[in-house]
Each structure stands twice: as structure tokens, then as C-alpha cells.
Amino acid sequence: MSLEFGREVTGRLDVAESREWLVTNGIGGFASGTVASTLTRRYHGLLVAALEPPLGRTLLVAKLEESLECRGEPRALSTNRWADRSIAPLGYRDVERFRLEGTTPVWTFAWRDVAVEKRVFMEPGANTTYVCYRLLRATDPVTVELRALVNYRDYHGTTRGAGWQMQVTPVAEGVRIVAFDGARPFVLLGRLEGTPTPAASAGGPGGPGLLPTSSMPGPSVEVRPAHAWYYGFRLAREEERGLDAQDDHLHAGTFRATLAQGHELTVVLSSEPAVSTAGAEAWQRRERHEAGVLAAWRRTSTGGERPPDWVRQLVLAADQFVVRRPLPGEPEGLTIIAGYPWFGDWGRDTMIALPGLTLTTGRPGHARRILSTFARFMDRGMLPNRFPDAGQAPEYNSVDATLWYVEAIRAYHAATEDDGLLKELYPVLAEMIRWHRQGTRHGIAEDPADGLLQAGEPGVQLTWMDARVGERVVTPRTGKAVEVNALWYNALRVMAAFASRVGRESEQWAGLADRVRTGFGRFWNEATGHLMDVIDGPDGADDRLRPNQLFAVSLSESPLSAARQRKVVNACARHLLTSVGLRSLDPRHPGYRGRYAGGPSERDSAYHQGTVWGWLLGPFALAYHRVYGDRETARGFLRPLAQQLVAYGVGSLGEIFDGDAPHAPRGTIAQAWTVAETLRAWTVLAP
């Protein structure tokens, strides 16, 4: 499929703003914005640096205000929404084409006989963004002027700039900025590359659309330090979300260069102590990185089929979530960002996403490092659910993250037969189960009466349905949750297999699993023909139809008979299935909310009360195949997600959708477990 738009999208501001792009650097930093180049979220910017990888994410550079001048006539290429609700300038009207090359966004601006190409990409492993402008055609020289708008704030916040004096200092090729005493310095640098000949514009050794790395003399880029606040950017998406929707940014420097055909102007934005301004060489490094990602995937692709282009794109998207988490004694630790632009690394999300992001894409070494990294954080039999951005202690408020960890290790071992890691982690897993049986935080403990896991205490959300409004947990699910006990049964069966593999006693695990399977029968609701969502809660059983019961079918070990598995799949298909995921609640229930919109309390009240979750389509497709044996139909459930790669987060899959048709995309523009589970299910279902 073509990840490309013409003026039918780029020329309509509301449509161009509804499509967002994302580039990442592998350490938690990123750049993101809209196809229209407007700032509509507080998270939009050209350099959101992970100053304490993978977190500490700080907006350093918001945007470059772009303009051209040809034959003495200026033309603004930028577009901004302002607090007074005006829109100026209107540069989006000159965007002739937008496309992705790999994960790199590329714009073509066309004005009269002038055409300029712009691309934005990041240096792998560094808080460095390259913004490259290449003159494609013009009958006369064209002057490009770029005003750099900077900031220095937490990426969740907004800025009021009045009275804030930053230190802007000229340096070779640009300016150095110190926002306040103790702030991390960052630089804005400019360089002109290429040979001004018509032949050069066809491309060259620098890669498609880029030039050889010969550099023009430094003075050919004029750099002027500045210090002028631009007040009142209106963040339309934040306004829709009921949040502070006004932001200010500092104009800290202007870059000006005259381009002949074949020239390329590169502006480098970086918080690194040393950085190269050679844009063409940086682009080659970016290309090599993505080529390596695809090569690893191709080596492990199953069967003789040629995967569709949208699956190939998801492999590149998968790479964006896997980032470094350095630890004492383990500088190469890895983790998974749950979603861009606002999530950090979450234990549950990491373990659910790990097989699809690493094993399916042919990178088991990454999976091993992630599993080893998280083992370091095991405490009282629990993995952390969240690592706060501000560097506080991890939060241990998940009943299922550790159970998903067991399943992730199972998937890793099935793919690699790495007995070495299994022997290393087996004692950790055995200790985890001991804690779960005897009791750990938040009332998580085995019920000796039936062997099932129970969990919950007032004010604490423990399952993946974890929304809260103030102090109220929207879906508390206190008691024995169905997917938790499906995972518990799966973990015990897996531990029995692990024990045999490493030469330990397996009967104890098998005996516990048999007991749980018997107890799991209590979830069955004969009247409705599906499983209860929670039993033994404060108010008894909760018989609402939710997708959580699917995991009793889709996991490697199922506690259900074949007949009941089929009934579960049928119930979910009839009432929860959509073309983009599964609803989190049966629409027939009076608590159903079909639209995810409004302020934080309204949105959180709908988050798991009908909102569609894309990641659930993978488990559903696998469950369907398990009971019906029809690979082609099962894969057919996944195919509509291909259209989402051009509908919201371009080149990726987002988090959630409205429960009601037409199922508008909401939430994050790129969600790890949506990408991962789609990739994993597609691969497992290969003929």
C-alpha cells in the first residue's frame, strides 16, 4: 500500500491535521506532528528528548517556522493556529505531497515553479533530529529562512513564556541554548550540502532523494541568534481533550540560506555533546538501521508467501517501541514504550507486546534483553506496572503483568529453545508463584477454596481495565477476574513444562493447574452462554460481556472445553467485534459508552465501557482460528487494520476507537500492543 497523500488530504487543513507522523530514536525520544505541520498537541515537536532514557522526555524544539523567497517574493510554508482562533500563515496550501519513506515523513512544497522537499528523521540512539530541505526545481535561486522555536518543558505540560530569559549563544554553524541554570544545553546547527547542478537533483550516493556529502562553505548558511517569544499557539487536540490548550515557544535563532537546484539545507537539533551536521551521512545511517530491521524480519518470515506492504510497514513501526533502558551493570537493557506520544514503558504492555515486536520481527536477542531487564525489577512476586517519568520508584499495581511475563518467556523459549535463560529465570518465576499463592500487594492471593487468584482493594486498579476518575476506579473488577485466572492457569501449565525442561519437579505445577481448571468452571454462565467477567466480587458475580474472556481461548493453554471455547468466541463476535478491534463492553449494557470524547473524566469513564481496543483483534483472530480452524477467515479480521496506517498515526496503529460506528480513532497515534498483536496474529496464521 502507498503511504502517500496528495492535495486531497494536504490541501484540507482539518483532514491534514487528523493525520499525524512519528519518528523515534530508540532511547525514548521522538519527534511528532501533523501532516499540516501545525502543533495540535502538547506532545508535538521536532525534538522531544529523552534526557533520562527512556524517560525524562522534554520538549526542546517545537518547530521551524519556514518561508521561501524567490525573485524577491516571499512565501510562508508554515501553518499555525492561534489562541484568538485565527490561522496564519497558511502554508499547508502549498503542500503538494506527503509520504513516508520507511518511517520518515517527507513533504513536497510546490509554489509556482519552485518545489522544495523536506524530511524529518532522528539519529538512532541519540537525542538528535535532522530536518533537511532540498530544492527540487526552480528557474532562479531560492532563499530558505527557518526560525527555530524552542522550549524546555516536560512533554506533558504547556508553557507561559513571559519573563523567561534563556541564554542563546552563537557557536560554529548555529546557536547553543541553555534554558535556565542546571538545564541540559542543546544546539541548533545548520549546514548546506550538495553540488548546485541540475544533475545532482536526481539523487546520488546519499540515498533516494539525497545528495553526496560534499559540503558547501560554512558562511553559505547565515545564522542569527534571537530571543523573541511567540505567544498563544492553540493546541486544538488538547482543547478537544478538555486540557490546557495554549502554549508559547521562544524564537531562538534564524537560519537563512540560498539554494540552487541540487542544494540541500540541513538543520540539526540536538542535546548531545557532539553531533554531526552532515545530513546525507545521517540519512544513510537511518536507512541502514531500517534496512537491518527489515532484513532480520525477512530471515524469519514463515512460508513462501510475500507479506503485504502494510505488514512490512508494521515491522518498521514495531521497531519504534523497542528502546534502551540502561541499568547499573547492564547498560544495554531494553524495554518497550507502551505508546506514543504520551506513554512510558509499562510492565503489562511490555510483556503483551514483546512477542510481536521482537520474536515476530526476527530479533530474539532483543526479547532476551527485555526479559532480563524486567527480572531486575521483580519485587514480592510482582513486576512493576509503570515507571514514572520523574524518576520515582516503580509502581507495582498490576495483577497480571507478571503472568504475562511468564507467557512472554514461553513464547521466547518456543522460538529459541534458549535453555540458558530459562534456567536463569526459573527460580524467579517459582518465587513469583509462591508470592501469588501466599499473598502479595493489593490483596493478590490464591483462594485456597478453588485455587483461583483473587485481587483488589479500594481505590486501586489492578487489571488492564485501569481507568479512574479522581479517586474512583471506573472498572474496579475486585474479586476473581476472568483473564487473570486464564493467565494464572496458563502460567501454571507453562511452569510444569519449564520444570521438565530444566530438570525440576513438574508435578506440583501440574497439580495446581488441574485445580485451577476445575475452579475456572465457576466462571461459566449457562444462561448467557459465555464467561462471567468477575466472580466473588464485593457484589457477587459480574456477568457483563467483555472481551477479557477471550484469553481463556487464545492463550497457549486453555482451561475450557472445545465447546465452551466456541461459545466464548461466538459471543464476542456477535456483540463486541468491529473492523478495528473489540468493544470493551457489550453495547446492550446500560453502562455502554459509544464515544470516547470530552474532558478527562468523560474520556476515562468511556475508556473500558465500550471503547474499541485494537490490540484485542489479534487474540480474537487466534481464538477464532483455534475453534474453527479457518486461517483465511481469521486473517480476514486483521486486514481492515491496514487502512488505519493512513488514517491516524501514519505508518502505525493507534490505541483505541469509538465503540459506535464509524469507529473514529482515538488515544495514542501509535500503540505497542496494537502493532505487536496484529503482527503476531498475522504471522501465526500464515498458511
Give each language-model segment a name.
Residues 1-687:
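Acidic, mature catalytic/reactive cores of soluble proteins
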